[in-house]
Amino acid sequence: MPVQGSQRRLLGSLNSTPTATPRLGLAANQTGARCLEVSIPDGLFLSLGLVSLVENVLVVVAIARNRNLHSPMYCFICCLALSDLLVSGSNMLDTAVILLLEAGALAARAAVVQQLDNVIDVITCSSMLSSLCFLGAIAVDRYISIFYALRYHSIVTLRRARRVVAAIWVASILFSTLFIAYCDHAAVLLCLVVFFLAMLVLMAVLYVHMLARACQHAQGIAQLHKRQRPAHQGVGLKGAATLTILLGIFFLCWGPFFLHLTLIVLCPQHPTCSCIFKNFNLFLTLIICNAIIDPLIYAFRSQELRRTLKKVLLCSW
């Protein structure tokens, strides 16, 4: 993912000498001030990436193997898993190449490394964009299933879902290529930030509206059966907790990365911003963690998918 020069480690690794860094400590910024820097060990980063990779591969395989899961909803979930898989895989590849170059185990010309860096950046950026898009698509799909339940199967058909999936992938690859080519322009970074905020607002509005409808439905059932108000309050609290977790994880995992991009535009030389820039690898790690959490939220809660996954694992043994 293109950011400022210090983060483009792949090309710089040709002439770099690895130095030991603490996992958590104080580092000096450009003005000599002390700032907090969290260093993520490469082993931990690769381990998290591997967990995400395996987890999302299992989701894709389970959905592909079970024809009962070939529905629009699971189509979006499968594509989300594929996007998260690419996010993890591309970052793992980037880190692995860096380590091999720094150790001298891989010899390559600067031009070759630059091309490889560009390819990895495009894959990473496009998979991030598609991951955000599919999170939004899942929210829209759930919204339609609740507010237009009787017309859902005529509105959200498998053909339309496939068209949406194709459009998301094509747009993600196209825009990520443009973003990488013009990564030095502030407008490009601001476009990415605005896109993230748009997805955040879209998901928040849709899920809050769905929560309000669920509370109204629970209240109607309670009145029909002459139940006490605490039952309705329990539904509201449970829904609010679920909504808080869902949006909270999304914001905490993705927010720091896009804050990083925003500060590159607003205050690239400010001492405080420089301290934040030092934690770029931490922000990437949070995105990898989101790729680990996504299957737990959107995929593994399905009993049908869990049964299919169990069969796949048993057959593999």
UniProtKB/Swiss-Prot annotation:
PROSITE patterns: G_PROTEIN_RECEP_F1_1, G_PROTEIN_RECEP_F1_2. Its main location: membrane. Coiled coil: none annotated. GO terms for biological process: adenylate cyclase-activating G protein-coupled receptor signaling pathway. The chain crosses the membrane at residues 38-63, 73-93, 119-140, 164-183, 192-211, 241-266, 280-300. GO terms for cellular component: plasma membrane. Belongs to the G-protein coupled receptor 1 family. PANTHER family: G-PROTEIN COUPLED RECEPTOR. This is Melanocyte-stimulating hormone receptor. It comes from Trachypithecus francoisi.
